Amino acid sequence: FFEFNRLETTMQTRKIPATIVTGFLGAGKTTLLRHLLTNAQGKRIAVIVNEFGELGIDGEMLKGCGIGCDENGEENGQLYELANGCLCCTVQEEFAPVMELLAARRDQIDHLVIETSGLALPKPLVQAFQWPALRNTFTVDAVVTVVDAPAVAAGLFADNPVAVDAQRRADDNLDHDSPLAELFEDQLATADLVILHKTDGMDPAEIARVETIVRAETPAGVKLVHVQHGRIDASVLLGMERAVEDAIDARKTHHDEEEDHDHDAFDSVSV
């Protein structure tokens, strides 16, 4: 009985580690998450995405809609339970309600992964985890930046800048109009791990040039990993234990002055 109570107390006090995955549209974030969910290695992973349909999860993997859903749908987010014990949430407008849903299921979650839209600034999202409502339940395990290596080699940063611009114009919640180069630098400045995606079709000189560009913008000691088709082992992606929310204020980005103002609530954070 004592051991059971101690285990229950540990589950209630344990913080859920959250990995934030950033990168432009077309970089391969969704491909990466799809591979992670289907190769979870027994981990019960909850994933927050903007659109569930983009993940392309096979219908047979869906166990059912456990919470946050009703027959008319849920505007602020839906939670899907997968057959392997993982969860998938959508968040289109408000961040806080979805986090509250996940906090209520903390004993069923080993790790949380948040995929940003690509235009979202990663630093304010990490800073949201400093708020007491999140800090007591979650910790930012790491920020992972997915880089489209061929696009960077071509000086474009994103695979399809026209599509990224269309995404920008379609997002009413976007509160900045930063050039892609600045966003790219911000994504790298906040990174704990950088994934160089799609390097399999590049020659060594191109890869070396991309690595030089990326290393110039990343903090010292950040690891660069070459990944093809999103195939990365869960043990590499998860479990870095960086507690990024404690150190994020010291990571300098282009938007630091904009981020300095006080927020009334973390609901306004863009994902």
Q: Which role fits each region the language model picked out?
A:
Residues 12-22, 27, 31-182:
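Nucleotide-state-sensitive switch-loop elements of NTP-binding domains
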Residues 162-271:
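C-terminal accessory "lid"/substrate-recognition subdomains
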Residues 1-10:
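Short, Lys/Arg-enriched N-terminal segments with co-localized hydrophobic residues
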